[in-house]
């Protein structure tokens, strides 16, 4: 059969057949169905692979009449042409070796189409248009002591499907794998307390915290404040300009940015000081609201935003978090005269989706 390859923006779809009206038998690729035959951690060329177990093909043959066989694999490196060509050449070899109807979804970006987010699975389901529910998914990344991650277990759980380890499927070994919610999340379980504070005269409110900490959620609960944000205006310079213009109206302003560096906050303190010197209106009070959830919680919420918006809300990349953490200067009373600092933690009623740590 002809092998069809379609290269989408965020993933590649490869198949040699149409979908049938059957449930899905889902598999990860590396260290679930195959491994490098060189013994190295990563394949060095398109020929550097072998089946993980001797019975992989015979097992797939045994389930093919009952299931659509689908591979879901994260392949971040295949954005580059050379890596993509090597990967596709290897996939063609694997399909030819298996000699069965097969479908492969290979994620090539970070975001909704990358496991454990559910984009690949949802795309597959939409292609089948089937009402079957007895799917399963098999993968090696399950959070065991020697596993590099728990991505596959999370992917199955996020899609509410049965999870199996390769050893369970191909060697019939029994296992009992469960996901344990990490303490960096469970410490924020519960209902969020409503943030209340008194405002006397015109007030400039600076939000402070990592992306995903819940700054905008707090801002949306504030009455009588006009928001200024990089997300809507695009640059810091435009935020400063907009704040200056709003101060001319003597109204309450909230700056909904990370504001994690002292230098950034000082720019707004300067506006308030210039305001006092110019005597254009009542002096602006400054309140800094520091959302102090740990960075792992914030990265989790960043992934959750991407998941719930089905990729419309783009992921803030890991490197941005690491850079912010390295440079973060949390607010202190000594920064400015008559400053008020409020610390607040965002809370979550219930965790449903599972995502990897930073």
Tell me the role of every PLM-derived stretch.
Residues 204-223:
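Glycine-rich phosphate-binding P-loop
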Residues 113-127, 133-171, 175-184, 221, ...:
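Conserved GTP-binding G-domain of TRAFAC-class P-loop NTPases and closely related GTPase folds
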Residues 217-266:
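Conserved substrate/cofactor phosphate-moiety recognition/catalytic segment
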